[in-house]
Structures are given as structure tokens and as C-alpha cells.
Amino acid sequence: MLFFGTYDHNLDDKQRLTIPSKMRNKILNSTVYVSKGFEGSLEMRTEEEFEKWSSQILNLSSFNKETRMITREIIANTHEVEIDKIGRIKIPNNLLKLANIEKSVYILGMGDRVEIWDQKSYDNYQNDNSDRMEEIAETIYQGLNK
């Protein structure tokens, strides 16, 4: 199952976010996991993807300080959330604060996961990195052709 596309949504007054129907149709049950992501985003995974992903993190050596730090940061900032009957999730307050989300969000399909961004933060991220995208793509795709 792959998630793709970019969707423009708003949190409602109770801080619930409606998952786009095209994404919701790919989620087999009503439980998803929302975690602190990178670059200021949140990440949402299905139960199956979360189990795979967290297993990889938890299998890293706990004797390494950096591993403990990143494991602590990610796993402690992950919440199991339920999708209600009309396709909404309630994002916990601590995650909203970590991602500077107030109302307007972008929901980005990222293959095996979904990123949730505050719109202003994502627009700034895009503006700050747009000049480098071609260079980065060249480097990445050259590695794929070897």
C-alpha cells in the first residue's frame, strides 16, 4: 500500500484532522500511529507499517548514546490514535506543539507513511530547499543507476 499526493486540510475546533478519503481507503483498520517526524513534521503510519518501522528502531543497539536519544525522541513521541466513523483522528496536544500545528495543515503521502505539516512550516521548508532539489535528485538518482 502506497500513500501519495498532497492534501490541504484544517483541524476542527476539537483538534481533529480528517484523513483524505483516498488515504483512508488504504487503511485496513481504525488504528494508526502518529509520531514526531523530521524537519518539523508529524508522521502517521498504519499499524502494520508502524510495527515494521518501530521494530527497526528498537533493534538498534541501546549501547549507543545517539541510538538511545533518537529512540527516546521518536518512540516517546508516538501515539496510537483511532480513526472515527467519519475519518478523523485527534492529534495529541504535545505532537501539535512539536510540529507547530495550529489549524491549517498539509497531508503528504510519502509511500509507506503520511506526513502532516503545519502549512506555514511546510511552505518555508519548500522555499528554503527548492533551489537544492535538482542537485539532491541528481545525487540520489545517480546512486540508483549503479
UniProtKB/Swiss-Prot annotation:
Disulfide-bond pairs as recorded: none
Subunit structure: Forms oligomers.
One GO cellular component term noted in the UniProt record for this chain: cytoplasm
Organism: Mesoplasma florum (strain ATCC 33453 / NBRC 100688 / NCTC 11704 / L1)
Repeat listed as a keyword: yes
One Pfam family linked to the record: MraZ
Membership in a protein family: Belongs to the MraZ family.
GO biological-process terms attached to the record: negative regulation of DNA-templated transcription initiation
Compartments it resides in: Cytoplasm, Nucleoid
Domain SpoVT-AbrB stretches: 6-49, 78-121
Main location (coarse class): cytoplasm
PANTHER family, per database record: TRANSCRIPTIONAL REGULATOR MRAZ
Keywords: Cytoplasm, DNA-binding, Repeat, Transcription, Transcription regulation
InterPro entries, per database record: MraZ, MraZ_C, MraZ_dom, MraZ_N, MraZ_sf, SpoVT-AbrB_dom, SpoVT-AbrB_sf
Gene3D superfamilies, sorted: Transcriptional regulator MraZ domain
PROSITE patterns the UniProt entry points to: SPOVT_ABRB (PS51740)
GO molecular function: DNA-binding transcription factor activity; transcription cis-regulatory region binding
Name of this protein: Transcriptional regulator MraZ
